[in-house]
Curated annotation (Swiss-Prot):
Glycans are attached at residues 105, 208, 321, 334, 527, 538. The lineage of its organism: Eukaryota, Fungi, Dikarya, Ascomycota, Saccharomycotina. Its main location: membrane. This is Protein SSH4. It comes from Candida glabrata (strain ATCC 2001 / BCRC 20586 / JCM 3761 / NBRC 0622 / NRRL Y-65 / CBS 138). Keywords: Endosome, Glycoprotein, Membrane, Protein transport, Signal-anchor, Transmembrane, Transmembrane helix, Transport, Vacuole. GO terms for cellular component: endosome membrane; fungal-type vacuole; vacuolar membrane. Residues 566-587 have a biased composition (Basic residues). InterPro entries: B30.2/SPRY, B30.2/SPRY_sf, ConA-like_dom_sf, SPRY_dom, Ubq-SigPath_Reg.
Amino acid sequence: MPLIPDSIQSIGVFHVDDPFNPMPDPGDADPETVAFAFFIGIAVVFSLLLITLVCTAAYLVCTSSYEGEYDEELANNGDGSRRGILNFRPLFGKKNSNGLLLDSNFTNPGEFDDNEEFIEREREALIKMSPFEVDSYMRAKEFQIVSPPAVQEFGTYLDSKDLQMIKDRGIQSYYFIPSINDNVDKSGHFLPSFLVQDKLEVEFTRWNKSSSAVLNYPLPYNKKDAVYFEVKVYNHKPNSNSIFSIGLVTVPYPYFRIPGMCKFSIAYESTGKLRINDPFFPSTLLPKLVEGDVVGFGYRFKTGTIFITHNGKKLMDVTQNVSVELFIALGAMNASYTRTYTKDGLLEDPDNIELRNALAEGRELKLSKDIQNPHNPMDETKWDIIDSDEIELHVNLGQTGFVFIEANVKKYGFGSVFGEIGIPPAYNPNDIQKDKLIQKGEELPPQYPEDTENFGLFGNLKIKSHIKNPLKEVSSNPSAPELIQKKLKTPIVKTPKVGIYEFTTPIDRKRETNMQPSINPPVYEINDTRQSSPEITNETISNEETVSSSSKAEPALQHGQSNKTPNKRQNKKTKQRKNKKKGKKNK
């Protein structure tokens, strides 16, 4: 048997031919060693995860404390700003790689540096502006000092009456406030900058210089993830001398400035600019708007994010951590009065710094006269006023379908179209023809019966009285006159017929003698004699004679006197007189 080298023995390898040293079974390895190695690997992984979590928590704690110090510093400013303004810091923007606008104060400069930077930027911008732009900027600045914007927490602007109105009427309660601009002609006639049609359709007129239309109510809480609205460019010429902007503002907002140019406002300009509290020269980040485009704005409640859509596609998230009351605003401005825009539209490269510097320094350039010498509507000597091209914008709050599909699926509209009151009645002629109740109007008034004696002109009416009428029992009997006479024990006077009717009247002797009003008024019955008329007999004539003679024999009552003689004594005297007369005749 050959000898096995020591190197081979050290690693436990044996020849197969050796019957005394067979190959060891690999399954015979120690299981405790394997389990120990497995647990060591798991411990290493969990330790790495724990270290990562600890580092993340430390970073978040440091960042939150840093932000708290920053908020406290801003809250202690001397400008009288409220705590709600702190939620609007992301509206001063620079764009990161993800398309989200971050705070321009991301490096947290001091208060003095911010003021100095703003003053320097304002000085450079005012030199490049036209007289109309400078005047509008100074007026807006003074306007917001006198009437500061109401930066309130979201959901605190409306009172109970407004909330009830929105609940009852739904989207029908929203409308744009009419124009209050101060445009007048030489005669003093009011020239509106824009007209509001059907509550949510705004048309900027040819008299518009620069104005904004603001919605009456802020963005509502619709109990969804977000609230969303869209604006369609219904009328806008390709080479228009007017520009418009669509956005969100706080109130009160300067009515002579378009959205995005004043504090606490954001707007999508038709030139492709995204204006966020920027009255100077913002960057062009969005596509230009033409006739037929649809622009959408959305606000997410949890994160306070505002996002923008264009023709149904989401472009970017603009801000975050916004929790103030915002109102929809539409604005338009005549570009003929500005130095940045031309009458034929926006310059090809509006962000060209060299071009702006050349305009500011007054160099001789081959530019149009509208750029070198913009029109000035405030010059009373020239009356240099250019008609503005009309612009029409339609707002959709959810009364119709959105172009943005997500808003339709998740129901991001402003709420119910007609509220809890419901839809008003329709006055369509086609619907009226199908209405069975309205079609029955041709058969009205109904045909009343001709028998007015039993039915009456106004129907078979019965009147209940609290006074008992002794004639009630005999009023329905055809032999009423005889029964009335027995009931009242008074004779009935029959007057001659007048036409085809005959009147019978009961006489109350007691009432005549005492001159006292009767509790129960006399009843007059009308007997229809068209079929048969009663005959006049000798008894009726004799009764009439006795009644007439007795009435003549009664003495006339004087004023303040009453006849105290009973009726029976008068009857006896009359009988005695008649008997005496008959006795004399017989003699």
